[in-house]
Amino acid sequence: MTMSFINQKLKIYAVAVLGSGMFLACAQTKTTVASKTSKETSQSGKVVPTNLKWSERMMLSEMQRFPEAWMLDFSKSPKWTYPSAIVLDGAEQLYIKTGKQEYYDYISEFGEKLIKEDGTILTYDIEKYNIDMLNSGNVLLYLYEKEKKEKYLKALQTLRLQIDGQPRTNEGSFWHKKIYPYQVWLDGLYMGMPFYTHYTKDFTKGADAAKAYNDIVFQFDSVQKNLLDKKTGLLYHAWDESKKEAWANKETGLSPNFWGRAMGWYGMAMVDVLDYLPENHPGRARIISYIRSYSDAVIKYQDKKSGLWYQVLDKPLANGNYEEATASAMFVYTMIKSVNKGYLPKSYKAAAKKGYDGIIKNLITVDENGVVNLNKCCAVAGLGGKPYRDGSYEYYVNEEIRSNDGKGTGPFILASLEFEK
């Protein structure tokens, strides 16, 4: 009995020693990995290497700030919204360009998080008919192309159903949201039309496709007709067909100011839609002509010294106005992509490059660890709602300004990729 007790104690001791050894080995392994990681960090000295091109530097900085893509635009919990898709467009192009798996994983994890196995889109409500909600469909189009997961197809079909039910003005333009009746916002062209065109190219055939393409081009024709100011060449932020909104001019239905980012959205909408609109569609030539007149107007309001654009485009000297990052990045992207695609003559590259250099010189800062920041971004601006947004000059210049807004970092990545071609 005594020997049995001693043997049992010896076994326990042996297990303890073995366990300690395993623990020590694990601890040593972890220490080695930690030591190696800290050594690599100390050798490079940077979380984001400074020898990379600006597109990757900004993308990696966003991934550092927002480890999961649903966090982009400072989201506190996963929700279906539009800003993530702009940055993920850059991630997609960087993955195609570099083959680095981390970019694809960042996109893929967004889809996994936001789309349930039955194809339900997290936090999305089709009945709101909010055109903003279509933009992230572009991410799903890419993921479905790559992974062919049924849940992505179901989610895409749901978003396409929204287009069928989206309320319209009497002449056929999409309302921006169901809660904003008869209102067309420039923002909505970017939020809805690239997705609508891309979906049509991938999934719609024959007469249905022709009808959809005509509908898409009509949205731009209608905006040119109803929102364009012929004197400046700029387009107003929004138009109320009913002329009932307090912000709307009682004769024209137009909002009172030229908001930089609204114009930015519109430019990106045109240049991105052309990626999917058939080459033989007669509407292509019209949209290209709109890009030309749009760019001419934008260049007129580019600051001669900095190369940047103001929050309210036509009032650079007014009290409180400022050179704003998101609009500046969007204008640069629209013009340089248009030059690269042949929609604009090469002479327009100078204005785009001046704007791009102006962003880097005046709006970009780099932390000691290499993380890149884009400053002076307007966080949000809109019309109507609660509290009521009246579209006045004072309203636009007093909205929150912040750094690293996805509505600026995304277009900056995309513009950088165009300059790096």
Where are these regions (language model features)?
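C-terminal motif of bacterial Sec signal peptides marking the signal peptidase cleavage site
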Residues: 24-25
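Aromatic- and glycine-enriched pocket-lining scaffold segments that form the walls
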Residues: 173-239, 248, 263
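CBM-like carbohydrate-recognition segments
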Residues: 40-85, 97-104, 113-131, 137, ...
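Oxyanion-binding "anion nests"
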Residues: 267-316
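Bacterial N-terminal signal peptides that target proteins for export
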Residues: 2-14
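Inter-helical turn/loop segments and adjacent helix faces that build the functional surface
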Residues: 199-214, 273-285, 338-346
